[in-house]
Amino acid sequence: MDIYSYNACVQQWADALFRFAYKCTGHEEDARDVVQGAFEVLWQKRGDVQQEKAKAFLFQVTYRQSVDNYRKKGKIVYKEAERTDLTHPQNPDLKKILDKALAQLDEQSRALVLLKDYEGYRYEEIAQITGLNESQVKVYLHRARKVLKAYLVNVENII
């Protein structure tokens, strides 16, 4: 990967990486640090990373650095960045309900749900990012969605 390809990766993936890191860390500064660290690792390994695989590589590094951040600080918080489709003015509490539902999941399940359902990644891409195989991703997502469904259909959790 040359400097032009690297710069293209920065322009193309910086925002998506920041959103993902922010959802994982819950803090803007931590998210910026994680994204910067991911791009530093890409720069250091630019000779080994192919342009086509840069996206998966960056998300994998971001995911791992978010986990490292969790270990250092002892807590990981998944937050949903402002999204007009989820935070419509008629449903201001929907974001809070969804955040509480996501908080019911373990760290790995939250990451999988965020990558698949919020960011729209394919199972194959999620497997590359997390180091799981596709079957594991599908099983863990299915289980996570069952937990979310059970939480969301409970009236006490919504009121």
What is each of the regions a protein language model found here?
Residues 9-28, 44-45, 102:
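Amphipathic, Lys/Arg- and hydrophobic-enriched alpha-helical face
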Residues 19, 33-40, 44, 52-64:
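Structural recognition of an alpha-helix C-terminal capping motif at a helix-to-coil junction
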Residues 130-154:
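DNA-recognition helix of helix-turn-helix
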Residues 97-105:
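Short amphipathic alpha-helical boundary/capping segments
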Residues 29, 124, 135:
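Residues within helix-turn-helix
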